[in-house]
């Protein structure tokens, strides 16, 4: 299907992800990743959106998402996660900067809305990727 190919360019750095690594993270979590995120991982992988040198802009790998969600490893006592990222209907998937993340809505089946804090910034992962490919900080003013 290759719907995420637009993000494969010299401005970004992605790493291949084996399906087995995706399955291991899902087993740890006890649920499947949203359909769009699974497709993205298998088509593109995980890695960095380059643009603003003052930001991390990282699509998190599945193991890190599991660590954050389960509060394990270095995320066990991470105060940045308290309160803001504890909604069971949302999944942290993207690191904007240290301690600042974007989340996906887990209630949708085909398309997952993307949120910056509590503000919806895209109706789907595909829409988010198109926007962030053009401007990696497009959503920052939307949170106000």
Regions found by a protein language model. Give the residues of each.
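A surface-exposed partner-binding patch
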Residues: 1-100
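Short glycine-rich, low-complexity/disordered patches
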Residues: 42, 140-144
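Short polybasic amphipathic segments
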Residues: 110-117
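Compact, glycine/acidic-enriched structural inserts
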Residues: 122-139
